[in-house]
């Protein structure tokens, strides 16, 4: 595993796993959210995002965290040797995302280039990460189920499906 793409619904542990693998294996950590979001939660123009991602993936070894299928998949997947799907159970994933969201709203923790997740925005807005989870969990599951059901479509990728946080920890311990 030298070039890893980690996918999954928001709050599934993609970034945490990518950082841990990068630290343990000496890989460059690339977080697609960091490339996508500019300060003030402004969306980086697609051409700039793709340029930054192309530059980042010139590294010999990396771990990319994030989905962004329409903007990133054609850059990362062909170069990758491993695809990891953080496929966490719905309610466990939602609960952990809720805990993270409350913590970030309370502490003002900075994410994605100095942005914060204010309480009102996360609990009373259509821009809520919780709302995003509700909109995308089933869609992501359908998409990645299809990928993992047809491994012959991605013969260059080792496909790894992690279905629990315990399984993710065990995978990391063995990596």
Where are these regions (language model features)?
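Conserved lysine of the Walker
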Residues: 14
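The conserved Walker
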Residues: 10
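A glycine- and Lys/Arg-enriched "phosphate-lid" helix/loop adjacent to the NTP-binding pocket
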Residues: 88-140
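Hydrophobic anchor at the beta1->P-loop junction of P-loop NTPases
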Residues: 6
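NTP-dependent small-molecule kinase module
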Residues: 24, 131-175
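Hydrophobic positions on the alpha1 helix immediately C-terminal to the Walker A/P-loop
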Residues: 17
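Conserved nucleotide-sensing/catalytic segment adjacent to the nucleotide-binding pocket
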Residues: 28-83, 88
């Amino acid at each position: 595993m030298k070039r890893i793409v980690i996918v999954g619904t928001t709050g599934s542990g993609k970034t945490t796993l990518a950082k841990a693998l990068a630290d343990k294996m000496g890989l460059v950590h690339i977080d697609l959210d960091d490339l996508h979001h500019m300060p003030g939660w402004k969306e980086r123009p697609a051409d700039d995002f793709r340029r930054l991602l192309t530059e980042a993936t010139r590294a010999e070894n990396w771990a990319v965290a994030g989905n962004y299928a329409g903007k990133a998949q054609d850059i990362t997947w062909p170069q990758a040797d491993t695809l990891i799907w953080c496929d966490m159970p719905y309610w466990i994933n939602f609960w952990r995302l809720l805990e993270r969201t409350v913590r970030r709203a309370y502490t003002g923790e900075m994410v994605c280039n100095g942005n914060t997740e204010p309480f009102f925005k996360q609990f009373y807005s259509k821009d809520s990460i919780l709302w995003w989870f509700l909109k995308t969990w089933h869609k992501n599951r359908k998409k990645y189920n299809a990928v993992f059901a047809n491994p012959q479509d991605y013969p260059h990728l080792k496909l790894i499906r992690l279905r629990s946080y315990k399984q993710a920890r065990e995978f990391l311990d063995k990596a």
